[in-house]
Amino acid sequence: MESTLKRTWAEIDLDHLTHNFEVIRRHVGDKVKLLGVVKADGYGHGAVEIAKRLEQLGAGYLAVSNIDECEELRDSGVTLPILMLGFTPADQTARILQLHMTQAVQSYAIAKEFSDRAVALGGKMIVHIKLDTGMGRLGFSCDEAHFDASLREILRVLSLPGLEVEGVFTHFSVSDEDTEESVEFTKLQHERFARMIEKVETQSGFRFQLHHCCNAGGIASYPEWAWDMVRCGIILYGSGDLAEKMGMQPVMSLKTRVATIKDFAAGEPISYGRTYFTQRPSRIAVLPIGYADGLHRALSNQIEVLTPYGRAKQVGRICMDMCMIDVTDLPQVKSGDEVEIFGEHILCADDAAPVSYTHLRAHETRHDL
């Protein structure tokens, strides 16, 4: 897929998505279900197209961050189970049932309200119980101080008549980091997860159909903790250091064209703030891409881009709609030449932005993906 907007555009390679999916499948084993996270319009890649390809590839589940994202997928014909990872107000119960959406529940109170409303509507809501093992966000707290109280609440959730409890999951906070402290904390999170599951299943006689804890970092570094399913988020899109180490291919390439080229004498300032001065007589090319397109201003004077004739350093402060590159050593570069900001041939998105999630998502509002 390629945008028709030729000022600056993103290209999405679904064959690279297929490659990444198969890499993950081999890494965790073919008995483990793969859940594809397609929240935030598939991290800016186009949720519908990504979801349909994942469905063809045999993904077991999808995940979104709000009910509207689920509705978009259902309206497009996607039939895979869809997990809503975060919070949904209980007054949306009818929509949840209508869309056959699986809802995460993080407290007995919210579970009870969902159950009551589902019973009143003559339905049953599929839910996954969310455990907070150290993220400090949503979920039943599994630290020592709250463990017993959370266990009692979860056992009560299992008996609610309007719910079909299908799964249980948690989210690692530092599984993508390899410091000794981070590794130990990730192990602690997994120990808490396993302990709560063992207590719930032993005391109730109930067994969850799906247990999942591995996000990108978990998939890459702890495949032995795959349980029944892993959640493939940013790593599926080939972005970040972990994806690179696993041999993933970037699904998105961000490209633009040279707008114009100007000659400067040595010692002349480029762009806002006079943060860069030419060190010699220079040819400076202007690109029609800036921080409004996701090329963060903090990257000013730090990155390189790829022209048809080699790499060029970005110089001067990145503007809202434009940035400049030094093509002094690339005399063949001319107006209209295609320039790759990141993609298959240069820079993973992690290098091209402080936070790859933000970077990939930022292109959606400016470019037709």
Residue ranges and their predicted role:
Residues L254-Q302:
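Functionally critical, mid-to-C-terminal surface segments that flank or help form catalytic/ligand
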Residues L5-K6, A40-L57, K112-I126, T133-R257, ...:
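Active-site loop/helix belt of alpha/beta enzymes
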Residues A298-L299, L306, V333:
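Short, well-ordered loop/turn sites that connect or cap secondary structure elements
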Residues I346-V355:
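Short, Lys/Arg- and Gly-enriched loop/turn segments at beta-strand edges
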Residues M1-T102, Y108, D116, K124, ...:
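A charged N-terminal "starter" segment
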Residues G290-A292, G310, I341-H345:
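Short, surface-exposed secondary-structure boundary micro-motifs
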